């Protein structure tokens, strides 16, 4: 069994046929889905889906692109949302300097609020970082000194140096379908070095469909393609990688129950 540790089931491309999307994924061997929110208005939607589907769980958080629109969001709102039994994670949150859709200082402040809630609740923090390695690593380290919290880097595309820094902090790394891309040689190399007990797989659906589905809307079913490719890189069987990543998910997201 595989678990898609990061997908957006409420996004265009999936929501129109969500029942079919989930059915196809289950047929492909996917037994769990973490449905990620990126705006406060999505929280109710992801929670409602998780209430209906026993193998779907929800996250609550604000994507860095949306930081300016949520600059006044307090920790209390996040804390209240985490009380729902189907909410198992905080995020996605973090820093994105590639698009700079939100002020960088606002992104940083909101990122720290999410970390505080992850620390207070013990729920894993789902971190997005793009073109912001130094600041992301610095904030993660500074906040870890204030008290430990569980966290993962989702859709990892950063450097080997950054991977080393976050692994030293105790974080988990999640690999998406990007690893299957022909030009992803550096990521493929890094993916072979991640410790077995710190590795997850994801789709980030409806984005980033892996080979052989490039150009299509990505679905959670495609996590099986990413897992097979990743297993080949790491020199293990697809079954062994599915077993280890599912075990890692259950340990990290301990509130998620099947």
Regions found by a protein language model. Give the residues of each.
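Mid-domain alpha/beta scaffold segments of enzyme catalytic cores
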Residues: 1-258
């Amino acid at each position: 069994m595989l678990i898609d540790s990061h997908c957006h089931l409420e996004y265009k491309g999936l929501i129109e046929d969500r029942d079919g999307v989930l059915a196809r994924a289950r047929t492909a061997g996917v037994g769990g889905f973490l449905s990620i929110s990126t705006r406060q208005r999505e929280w109710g939607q992801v929670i409602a889906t998780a209430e209906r589907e026993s193998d779907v769980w929800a996250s609550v958080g604000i994507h860095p692109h949306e930081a300016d629109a949520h600059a006044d969001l307090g920790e209390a709102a996040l804390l209240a949302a985490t009380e729902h039994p189907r909410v198992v994670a905080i995020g996605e949150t973090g820093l994105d300097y590639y698009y700079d859709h939100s002020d960088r200082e606002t992104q940083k402040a909101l990122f720290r609020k999410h970390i505080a809630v992850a620390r207070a609740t013990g729920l894993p923090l789902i971190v997005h970082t793009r073109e912001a390695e130094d600041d992301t690593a610095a904030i993660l380290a500074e906040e870890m000194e204030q008290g430990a919290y569980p966290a993962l880097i989702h859709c990892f595309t950063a450097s080997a140096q950054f991977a080393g820094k976050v692994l030293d902090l105790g974080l988990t790394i999640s690999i998406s379908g990007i690893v299957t891309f022909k030009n992803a040689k550096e990521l493929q190399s890094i993916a072979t070095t991640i410790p077995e007990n710190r590795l997850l797989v994801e789709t980030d659906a409806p984005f980033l469909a892996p080979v052989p589905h490039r150009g299509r809307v990505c679905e959670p079913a495609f996590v099986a393609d990413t897992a097979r490719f990743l297993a080949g890189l790491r020199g293990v069987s697809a079954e062994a990688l599915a077993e280890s990543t599912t075990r890692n998910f259950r340990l990290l997201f301990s509130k998620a129950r099947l």
